[in-house]
Amino acid sequence: AKKIAAMAQSMDLSATQAAEMGESFQLMGVQTDKMEEHILETYKSSQAMGLNATKVIKVLQQSMKSMQSYSFAGGVKGMTSMAQQAVKMRLDVDDVLQMADKFYQPEAAIEAAANLQMLGGDIADAFGDPFETMYLARNKPEELAKKLGDMTENMMTFNEETGEYEFPAEVRMQLKSAGEQLGINTDKM
């Protein structure tokens, strides 16, 4: 209990949030000592990625119950990867899980992939294979989130005048159409 309280304080979680997180970890077979190690590892890897590590921990804590109903490669590590991707892309984990739901059934995956292939480019490359996407949705939703992140990164261009990355107008239109097929609100990205 002392370790959980200390962790809660250092991660800016309430005692209740930390206890709920501890329960979720225990339901997955992760004991308190291992939980502490995992949280510290998550904190360090999130910082190394340039992310707000405390926010990643909070997203993990808030989304753990919904993520437990999916198969993640590597268990808690896969869930952590999903939380990191969500923070990186400014998406809710639930949005990414909705995308996984959309590709869960073969018919829906084939139809969505066909529509995404028509958009071409990075979108077709990322989500054009319905069976790969369906496999990821069923077994590795964190990889599905990574694909989404990689796709959007490849679509950005660097504006040398402003020194910022941006989406050209045609790319924004493609993203909007892709978002409709993926079941994701691209305005949040």
For each feature predicted by the language model, list its residue ranges.
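Amphipathic alpha-helical interface segments used for oligomerization, scaffolding
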Residues: 1-189
